[in-house]
Regions:
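N-terminal hydrophobic/helix-forming segments and targeting peptides
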Residues: 1-162
C-alpha cells in the first residue's frame, strides 16, 4: 500500500462524523475501506469487524482495535437570533471551546457555526478566570430566528472542525 493511499484512507476516516451514539457514518466509511481486504461485518452496535485473508483454523489472530466515535455536542434548544443551546456528548476540555468553528449535522444537510460564550468584558472577574460551563455556551449559526427554526432541531449533532 502506497503512502498516498494510506493518507487518503486517513483523510476519509477523519473527515467523516460519528458522534458517540450515532457512529454509523464512521462505521460505514471504515467498512467501505476494509471491504477490498476481506470479509466485513458491522454489528448491531456499530462495531466493524473484518477478517483479512482467512487462513488455517489454527493460524494466529491479530486484533486491531480503535474507537470510531468522536466527542461532540447535541442541540438541546433553539434560542432567538439563530443561536443554539447545546449539551456535550463525551468529555471536552472546555477551555478550547469558545470561538471554535463547528459543523451542525442536520436532516437538511451540514451547516457551519461557531461556539459563542459571554464576552470577557461582560463576564464577572470570577467567571473570566475559569472555562465556561457547557450549559453557558451557544452555537452562533449566523441565521435569523426563522431560518434557524427551518434548519435546526433539538437532537441535531455538532462536531468540532479541525
Amino acid at each position: 500500500m502506497t503512502e498516498e493511499r494510506i493518507l487518503d484512507m486517513a483523510r476519509r476516516l477523519t473527515q467523516v462524523h460519528g458522534v458517540s451514539g450515532r457512529e454509523y457514518p464512521a462505521a460505514a466509511a471504515a467498512a467501505e475501506l476494509l471491504a477490498p481486504m476481506g470479509q466485513v461485518e458491522i454489528s448491531p452496535l456499530g462495531s466493524v469487524c473484518c477478517t483479512v485473508c482467512p487462513g488455517a483454523p489454527d493460524a494466529p489472530h491479530i486484533v486491531l482495535e480503535a474507537h470510531l466515535d468522536q466527542i461532540g455536542l447535541i442541540v438541546t434548544h433553539l434560542e432567538e437570533n439563530g443561536f443554539l443551546r447545546v449539551a456535550n456528548v463525551g468529555g471536552f476540555d472546555r477551555r478550547l471551546l469558545p470561538a471554535a468553528p463547528v459543523t451542525i449535522h442536520t436532516e437538511n444537510g451540514d451547516f457551519p457555526g461557531v461556539i459563542a460564550s459571554v464576552p470577557p468584558h461582560l463576564a464577572s472577574d470570577e467567571d473570566r478566570e475559569k472555562p465556561p460551563k457547557i450549559e453557558d455556551l451557544l452555537i452562533d449559526t449566523g441565521c435569523s430566528t426563522e431560518t434557524a427554526r427551518q434548519r435546526f432541531a433539538p437532537g441535531d449533532l455538532i462536531t468540532l472542525d479541525g
